[in-house]
A protein has these predicted regions:
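Secreted/periplasmic carbohydrate-active enzymes, especially glycoside hydrolases
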Residues: 1-154, 160-162, 166-170, 191-194, ...
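Acidic, His- and aromatic-enriched active-site or binding-groove loops in soluble protein domains
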Residues: 172-176
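Short glycine/proline-centered loop/turn elements that form peptide/ligand docking sites
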Residues: 178-182
């Protein structure tokens, strides 16, 4: 689902991945609003796996203020029989990241204040139950957060759904962290593809994270640079609607070539924790 806002309306491109369709079958595309009312519908031959639907007077997904979601359904139809059908929720919104104004959601400044979240519990590990995910997001919202960095790996689909529903702005990333391994390139590529494909329809996600603190010394490793270029280019090819970022540590110079690869520069600072003191945060924030 790729929505594009056009004035008061939205044009939504839908791409379907289909195998083993018969020549006489067709695809029926339907969009329903949050109340279940049909707002757009079209159909194509089964061999045409892309369609564009128009949503008049579109209701925007507007973060915590109004996290409005539509539901799209695509049905494979043979005669009068529905052979198969899939559905997904999505939201329509615009965003940009401005160096002076910060994060802009639907044309308005939308300050981001948030946390990093690990999918982990004592005695449970990574195998969280739905109630644990709900408790996490309730605590995060209670803090007044507007954004979450989902560190540093793919999280449960249920939590991405909760983020869509609650209007959190999300940074999603792969587990490419701490040190670069030349023999791990194909793994990073595979995980990046999976992250984008599996989570493409979530309106809460605005940036894809390529790596986390992969070096403390900058870009002396050409293979590391090339790996990041490959990931960055691949993400932009797969998704032209979102931005890329990496998380770097304070010691890396902001002009380092490695830091300049993604769209957004993001720093992890630990002043007063691993080193220094909290007063050192001020100059960076200024």
């Amino acid at each position: 689902m790729t929505p594009e806002i056009k004035g008061a309306d939205a044009s939504v491109e839908v791409e379907v991945f289909l195998t083993n369709a018969a020549a006489d079958q067709k695809l029926v595309y339907t969009v329903k609003d949050a109340e279940g009312k049909e707002v757009a519908k079209t159909e194509t031959a089964a061999g045409e796996t892309k369609a564009v639907l128009s949503i008049p007077a579109v209701h925007l997904w507007n973060g915590k203020k109004d996290p409005y979601l539509y539901t799209a359904e695509v049905a494979l139809v043979s005669g009068e029989e529905t052979v198969d059908a899939v559905s997904t929720r999505f939201g329509c919104r615009t965003f940009e990241i401005d160096p002076e104004r910060g994060f802009i959601l639907n044309g308005e400044e939308y300050p981001l204040r948030g946390v990093s979240r690990h999918q982990d519990r004592w005695g449970i590990g990574n195998a969280l139950l739905p109630e644990h995910h709900r408790e996490d997001i309730d605590l995060i919202c209670e803090l007044g957060a507007t954004t979450i960095r989902l560190a540093h790996y793919q999280h449960d689909q249920y939590f991405y759904d909760l983020c869509d529903e609650r209007g959190l702005v999300i940074w999603a990333e792969i587990p490419y962290i701490s040190s670069h391994m030349p023999n791990g390139r194909e793994n990073t590529i595979s995980q990046m593809k999976e992250l984008v494909v599996q989570n493409y329809n979530h309106p809460s996600i605005v940036v894809w994270g390529l790596s986390n603190e992969i070096t403390m010394a900058g870009s002396s490793d050409e293979d590391l640079l090339e790996n990041h270029r490959i990931l960055n280019d691949m993400v932009h090819e797969m998704d032209h609607t979102r931005l890329t970022t990496i998380a770097v540590v304070s010691m890396c110079d902001i002009h380092d070539p490695y830091i300049q690869i993604p769209d957004v520069i993001s720093y992890n600072h630990y002043f007063g924790w691993y080193g220094g003191d909290v007063s050192m945060n001020g100059p960076w924030m200024d």
